[in-house]
Regions:
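Transmembrane-helix signature of polytopic, membrane-embedded enzymes
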Residues: 3-25, 44, 67-68
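Transmembrane-helix signature of membrane-embedded glycosylation machinery that interfaces
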Residues: 3-12, 50-53, 57, 135
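Short helix- or helix-capping micro-motifs
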Residues: 19-24, 31, 51, 77, ...
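Short acidic/glycine- and proline-prone juxtamembrane loop motifs at membrane-interface regions
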Residues: 34-41
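Hydrophobic core segments of transmembrane alpha-helices in multi-pass, intramembrane catalytic enzymes
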Residues: 42-50, 72
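Transmembrane-embedded, aromatic-rich helix segments that form part
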Residues: 44, 86-104
Length: 179
């Protein structure tokens, strides 16, 4: 349903229905269901974060809608980061999309779009998301200001991807691959 809402917002309702059917009937979708229970939550948070960003960009001038979308964005991003912190990296294309639309294309935003409101709202979204993330991680409750950042630094030091790779007929640990 979220894919339909995003497609309908970007294109039209007919395109939204077609894109929803293609995504829903895609056999890869059913093949990967329940592979990792966290991925379902991450996908949910990513889709709804995208939709909420689109609606925020369209309706920033309406005070009630703006507050509503800021709260929802904080909740969905907090849900995603509460499950897995690398979720933040999946939001980078959204941020890039927003910056391009705000400063260059203005296809979704209107002429009255305020960058100052956007920055203030982004701070509120990040505070809400951070609060939910900390709430979901009981091992950081001892010090909610330093422990999450220590864990983030530990995760950044570890290698990403598969632990072993076949290179030139020899198996190597991914982070010790000769170049």
């Amino acid at each position: 349903f979220g894919i339909y809402k995003i497609s309908s917002t970007l294109f039209n309702k007919q395109a939204g229905k077609i894109i929803f059917l293609i995504c829903f009937l895609n056999p890869i979708f059913f093949g990967h269901m329940a592979m990792n229970p966290k991925d379902t939550i991450i996908a949910f948070a990513n889709i709804w974060s995208t939709y909420i960003l689109l609606k925020y960009l369209q309706n920033q001038n309406s005070s009630n809608k703006r507050k509503h979308y800021v709260l929802l964005a904080g909740l969905t991003i907090g849900l995603g980061t509460g499950v897995r912190i690398p979720f933040l990296m999946t939001l980078m294309p959204l941020l890039l999309f927003a910056v391009v639309d705000i400063f260059f294309t203005k296809k979704i935003t209107n002429s009255k779009f305020s960058i100052n409101k956007f920055i203030v709202d982004l701070i509120f979204v990040l505070v809400i998301a951070y609060s939910l993330t900390v709430f979901a991680w009981p091992h950081v409750h001892g010090n909610i200001f330093t422990e999450p950042f220590k864990l983030l630094l530990i995760q950044l030091k570890s290698s990403f991807g598969v632990p072993w790779i076949l290179f030139d007929g020899i198996f190597y640990e991914t982070d010790k691959l000769p170049y």
